[in-house]
């Protein structure tokens, strides 16, 4: 699954440099004549997003042997302020990533998405520490961050049902990191079988999926304005949410 994901991103990146709506002689391409892509069913052996169980086993063996560079890398993780089990989540009711010039006066919290960025980093790093050390305090801390956002955040800020600034689309960058943390924590105290886990999956899907899918379809009605980084933010959000929720339709998108 990991290699499929890396391959997909590599191909997408390559195509971004060579894609064109015309062939060499100038004749337009009729994309409607192309065959529909084959739908593939992936067997998901969780965890299977950025890291697999085999990856964790490999790293734990290296750490047990104090092998380098793994030992130094883990020491760096241990020293991170985001990997401290005393870390406290700071969820917001409505996420905002707004342009300062246009929105600072009306929305003093115009960049409160940074709360999510920090908490996503902490949830992921704490999940790694739990998985690599088997110490409960790290699993508890990571889980509490994810639960706090699922319980307290209502989504991305909108007015009249629409985003008010295209920069809000980039909040999707955090979806992948959040989903990775949750994917790692599936096995923590059977969290993946709990109502808390289901609530988190529902929250991350309702917050990010529709926005990401709509952007990939319409590109905010200005397709020539957006570069590939905007697409990748939405693609990784959809793929990671699909893996987390075992949703083959999302994965195939």
Language model features: what each stretch is:
Residues 20-220, 232, 236:
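Extracellular glycan-targeting catalytic surfaces
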Residues 228-232, 248:
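Alpha-helix initiation and capping sites
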Residues 7, 12-15, 55-57, 65, ...:
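A generic structural micro-environment signature
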Residues 1-29:
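Bacterial Sec-dependent N-terminal signal peptides
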Residues 129, 225-228:
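RNA pseudouridine synthases
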Residues 240-253:
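Long, repeat-rich segments with strong aromatic
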């Amino acid at each position: 699954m990991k290699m499929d994901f890396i391959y997909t991103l590599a191909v997408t990146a390559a195509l971004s440099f060579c894609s064109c709506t015309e062939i060499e002689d100038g004749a337009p391409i009729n994309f409607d004549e192309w065959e529909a892509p084959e739908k593939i069913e992936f067997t998901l052996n969780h965890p299977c997003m950025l890291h697999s169980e085999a990856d964790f086993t490999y790293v734990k063996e290296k750490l047990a042997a104090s092998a380098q560079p793994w030992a130094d890398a883990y020491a760096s993780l241990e020293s991170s302020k985001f990997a401290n089990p005393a870390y406290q989540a700071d969820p917001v009711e409505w996420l905002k990533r707004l342009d300062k010039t246009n929105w600072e006066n009306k929305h003093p919290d115009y960049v409160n998405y940074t709360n999510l960025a920090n908490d996503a980093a902490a949830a992921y790093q704490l999940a790694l520490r739990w998985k690599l050390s088997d110490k409960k305090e790290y699993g508890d801390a990571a889980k509490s961050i994810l639960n706090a956002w699922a319980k307290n955040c209502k989504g991305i800020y909108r007015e009249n049902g629409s985003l008010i600034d295209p920069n809000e689309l980039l909040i999707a960058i955090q979806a992948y990191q959040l989903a990775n943390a949750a994917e790692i924590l599936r096995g923590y105290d059977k969290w993946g079988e709990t109502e808390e886990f289901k609530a988190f999956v529902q929250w991350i899907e309702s917050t990010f999926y529709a926005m990401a899918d709509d952007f990939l379809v319409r590109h905010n009605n200005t397709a020539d304005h957006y570069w590939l980084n905007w697409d990748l933010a939405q693609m990784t959000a959809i793929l990671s949410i699909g893996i987390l929720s075992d949703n083959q339709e999302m994965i195939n998108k």
